[in-house]
């Protein structure tokens, strides 16, 4: 689930049932593909893609491999399967590491959050909870003056985690109560609508066209339309919405228990590496689709969906290959997986690495820093999303960052991107986007972006961390 979905859903919940109808806002007035348009010619604050192609007309292009470190990609999608990176040194399906890179049958990339037995990590805990409980016994009630210099730095991180965890108490409990009641109401409304529509699955668009007869069905329609539109996801189905809602609710319930209950180690049970040994790096599997490839599929379509084929959408780049690296679960990613994902991308020819994820703590950031430095020696650019917390990154964190641990130096091969919009799409700067005069380099379209989604030939809107793709 996208982090924007979570944020907008939470903001919508307290008033979701207070209105019997949804007031259409200007965000619905932008066309599909507005992010590619030109302000002077088309009236939208897009990236002026046609002008860019006109500028390079007649010039010879070179194929660029873009690594997408994300939740996975639907490798069967009609608009993506022909632009996927193929490891030509590997023979598919023979169970042999033909290219001797340590990863067996890595045809389109690698899944760092999978097990050799074929199982995959779908959900995971939040880093703040992992940090808090890892050091709780060591630092609780300790006199910090007795600590070594190294431990003092870890103590500072733990105190920040403690403040966030303990401070989540009563307020978070009330939010979860609202979430639970609203989810139960959504399930009830869905059961009413499925009977009224005489179908088990329906999209927001189908629901909007439906004219209910009974007052009960009218109220149920109003509720679901509100949620669909609040997330700019009219193409989403009722089943997908309730599944994502349930996942989010589960995560929020875990947060309220975080102070007393240590998070489950989902990754360890499946991946089975020695996490603390960075040299134990040849783990995972080649299932790059795995469980929930929504975000990665959407991102990849924006980058390189086949252009001018009359299907779905046109991607930005017309001579690109997408390398799929799955390292981001529903929850917070682990630093080791991200560091190894970056190294895998570099070693296998990627020239750009797309990273549409983030978290507020990064205890093993030094591993990522070394991977970023390695990428720099190979001329590889890393593009990272600023994040969707509406926070000032000059005074808060969204890891990974360009700043190296224990240094004032920044990675020269790193760009941090915030999400922009359009006046017709709610404003030039997306309301949810992080920002920062010093820490955010540029803004790019990130509101109501239409692209490929899992399902083979399916498309829909999403928004948030995917803004960096336009850079």
Give the positions of each predicted feature:
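Hydrolase catalytic cores
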Residues: 300-303, 323-330, 343, 347, ...
């Amino acid at each position: 689930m996208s982090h924007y979905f979570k944020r907008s859903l939470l903001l919508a919940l307290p008033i979701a049932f207070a209105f019997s109808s949804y007031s259409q806002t200007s965000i619905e007035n932008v066309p599909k593909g507005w992010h590619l348009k030109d302000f002077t010619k088309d009236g939208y604050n897009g990236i002026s893609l046609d002008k860019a192609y006109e500028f390079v007309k007649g010039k010879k292009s070179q194929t660029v491999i873009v690594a997408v470190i994300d939740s996975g990609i639907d490798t069967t999608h009609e608009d993506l399967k022909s632009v996927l990176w193929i490891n030509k040194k590997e023979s598919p399906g023979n169970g042999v590491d033909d290219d001797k890179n340590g990863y067996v049958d890595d045809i389109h990339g690698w899944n760092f959050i999978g097990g050799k037995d074929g199982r995959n990590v779908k959900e995971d805990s939040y880093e703040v909870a992992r940090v808090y409980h890892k050091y709780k016994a060591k630092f609780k009630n300790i006199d910090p003056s007795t600590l070594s210099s190294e431990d003092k730095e870890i103590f500072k991180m733990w105190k920040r985690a403690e403040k966030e965890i303990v401070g989540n108490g009563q307020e978070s409990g009330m939010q979860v109560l609202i979430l639970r009641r609203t989810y139960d109401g959504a399930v009830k409304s869905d059961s009413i609508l499925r009977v009224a529509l005489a179908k088990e699955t329906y999209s927001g668009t189908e629901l909007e066209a439906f004219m209910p007869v009974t007052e009960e069905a009218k109220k149920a329609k109003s509720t679901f339309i509100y949620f669909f539109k609040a997330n700019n996801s009219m193409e989403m189905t009722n089943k997908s919405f309730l599944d994502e809602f349930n996942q989010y609710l589960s995560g929020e319930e875990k947060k309220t228990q975080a102070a007393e209950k240590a998070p489950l180690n989902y990754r360890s049970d499946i991946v089975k590496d020695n996490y603390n040994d960075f040299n134990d790096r040849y783990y995972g599997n080649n299932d790059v689709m795995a469980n929930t490839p929504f975000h990665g599929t959407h991102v990849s379509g924006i980058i390189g969906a086949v252009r001018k084929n009359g299907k779905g959408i046109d991607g930005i780049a017309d001579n690109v290959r997408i390398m799929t690296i799955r390292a981001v679960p529903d929850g917070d990613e682990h630093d080791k997986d991200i560091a190894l994902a970056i190294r895998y991308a570099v070693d296998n020819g990627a020239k750009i690495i797309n990273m549409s994820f983030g978290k507020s703590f990064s205890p093993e950031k030094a591993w990522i820093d070394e991977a970023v430095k390695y990428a720099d020696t190979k001329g590889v650019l890393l593009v990272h999303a600023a994040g969707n917390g509406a926070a000032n990154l000059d005074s808060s964190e969204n890891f990974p960052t360009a700043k190296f641990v224990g240094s004032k130096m920044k990675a020269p091969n790193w760009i941090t991107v915030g999400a922009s919009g359009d006046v017709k799409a709610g404003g030039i700067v997306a309301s949810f986007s992080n920002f920062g005069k010093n820490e955010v380099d540029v803004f790019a379209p990130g509101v109501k972006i239409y692209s490929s989604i899992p399902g083979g030939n399916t498309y829909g809107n999403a928004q948030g961390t995917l803004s960096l793709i336009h850079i």
